[in-house]
From Swiss-Prot:
Cofactor: heme; Cu cation
Protein name in UniProt: Cytochrome c oxidase subunit 1
Cofactor detail note: Binds 2 heme A groups non-covalently per subunit. Binds a copper B center.
Keyword set, alphabetical order: Calcium, Copper, Electron transport, Heme, Iron, Magnesium, Membrane, Metal-binding, Mitochondrion, Mitochondrion inner membrane, Respiratory chain, Translocase, Transmembrane, Transmembrane helix, Transport
Amino acid sequence: MLPRWMYSTNHKDIGTMYLIFGAWSGMLGLSMSMLIRMELGQPGTLIGNDQIYNVIVTAHAFIMIFFMVMPIMIGGFGNWLVPIMLGAPDMAFPRMNNMSFWLLPPSLFLLINSSLIESGAGTGWTVYPPLSSNLSHYGPSVDLAIFSLHLAGASSILGAINFITTIVNMRSIGMTMERMPLFVWSVLITAILLLLSLPVLAGAITMLLTDRNFNTSFFDPSGGGDPILYQHLFWFFGHPEVYILILPGFGMISQIICYNTGKKEPFGNLGMIYAMAAIGLLGFIVWAHHMFTVGMDVDTRAYFTSATMIIAVPTGIKIFSWLATLHGSHIKFNTSILWALGFVFLFTVGGLTGIMLANSSIDIVLHDTYYVVAHFHYVLSMGAVFGIMGAIIHWFPMFLGLNLNSMLTKVQFMITFIGVNLTFFPQHFLGLAGMPRRYSDYPDFFTKWNFISSLGSLISLMGVIMLIIIIWTSIIEKKMINFSSFTNSSIEWMLNFPPSEHSFNQNNIILK
C-alpha cells in the first residue's frame, strides 16, 4: 500500500494526495484564521503579543495560498481532470509529477518550524525588508520561511512545466486548442503565469537571504541598496499569483455552469478563452498598484491606475458570459450550481471593491486598512474557496463513485454563505473608518463590526466542519452510484465512477 502512494506515477493517485494535503493544510490555515478572529473579537489582548499575532497572520496567508488553494486547484483538480479531459493516458512527466507533490510536505514542515523557532517570522506574507532584515528579525525564522517558499516554488514550477507539456502535446486526435474544455485552458494559462512569475520571487527572496546572512546590501540603504526594489520584485510575482489562485476557479465554475445548464460549452467559448489569456497577460503589468504609497511619481501612478482598471474588462466578459450561459436555460439546481452562482455574485462584489482600490488617490487613504483585507478575501475566500467547494461537490461522485447527501450539502452551502459574508462585509466599514491591518488590538470605536466579523467566522467554521462530516458519512456509508444520470457535458462523465486506474487504453478521437 505504501509504495503505491509514495512512489505513485498515476495522475489520479497524485491528485488525490494533493487534495488530502490541501484539505489538511486548509484546516491548519482555518484554525489560524480563527485565532486571528478571536483575538480581534473584542478590544484588549487575547494572545498577548503583537509579534506572535503577526506570526499567525503570516503563516495563515502562506498556508492558505501555497498549501491549500494551489495544491487543491492546480495539484488536485488539475492532476485529476486535465489528463482525462484531454483524453490523455496520464501527465507528460509522471515521476516529476510525484516529485512536485513530495516537495510540498517538507515545505510546510519548514514553514511551521519557522514559527516555532525563536520568535517566529512576523513579517506579513509580503516579507518586506527592513522588517524582515536580520536587524528586526534576527534568528533563523525568516530564513526557514524563505526556504519553505523556495521548495513550494520549485514544486509549482515543476508542476507548471508538466501541465504545459501535457496540454500542448497530449491532446486526443481531433481535439484542437479551441475545443479544449475551459478548465484545461485555465490550468494552461495558470501554468504559464507560474512559470514566468515564480523565478522572480525566488530571486527576490534569495537576495533577502543573502542580505540577512552574507552581508550583501540589495535592500539595505546603508550599503547602497533599496528596499523598494524588493517590493517591485515581490509584487511582480505577487500580482500574477492572485490570478494564479483565481484562474483555475474560473475554469471550474465554467464547467459547473455548463454541466448544470445542460450545455457542452458556455456562451462565447472563444471569448472566454481570450478573456482568461488577457487577464493572465495584464496581470503582469499592474504590480505597482500594491505600492501606491511608496512615493512613485504621478505619471507612474496614473499608468498603474488605468492598467489595473483595464483588467476589469476581460473579467466582466467572463461574468456576463456566465450569466448569458445561465440565461434562459433549464438550470438543474443541485448544490454545485449554488456554489457557482455564489461565486459569480461575490466575485463581482470583490471585483468592484478592487476597482475602488485601483484609484491611486483613494488607495493612499485605504492602503493597509481592512478595506483591502475585505477586498481580497471577497475575491479569495468567496472566489477561490467557493470554486473549490463547488468543484468538490461537483466531481466527488466521479472521483470516488459515491453520492453526497444533496440536502445536507445545500444546508452547508447556506451556512458557509452566511458565515463568509458576515465575516468580511463588515470589514469594508472598518477599513473606511480607518482601522489598519496587522494590529492585534484596536480602539473600542471599532468593537461592533469586529465582533460581528468574528461571529461570522464561527459560522464559517461550522460550515467547514459540516462539509467534513458530509464527506465522511458518504464514505463510511458507501453511498454507491447505482445508475449514472450524469450529463455528458465533458469527457470525464463518460468514464466509470470512479475511473479505472488507467482511464483510456487507446488513443481517443474527439468528434464534435
